[in-house]
Amino acid sequence: MDVQRSSYIFIALSIIAMFLITGVKPEVRDICPGVCHAGIEPDCDTLCISMGFTGGYCQGLTCCCNPKSSKSSIINRPI
């Protein structure tokens, strides 16, 4: 009986591990990190700039950040 129970536990844990590795992840909202409202500090633009984005905008009551620039500000020229 213990061997059968152990195999069921192993199968159940394997299925759970499979879902954790491949499966459902919560939506990461790092592009929209805050809330827009008149009394909230810091404002959306300041929040996004402090996180390394180029700026921010309000989408309803959600503060969303502009995409980060793909160009580097420092360009190394070949010798």
UniProtKB/Swiss-Prot annotation:
Coiled coil: none annotated. It comes from the Eukaryota. It is found in: Secreted. One of its GO terms (biological process) is killing of cells of another organism. Disulfide bonds join 32-65, 36-58, 44-63, 48-64. Residues 1-26 form the signal peptide. This is Putative defensin-like protein 80. It comes from Arabidopsis thaliana. The gene is LCR81.
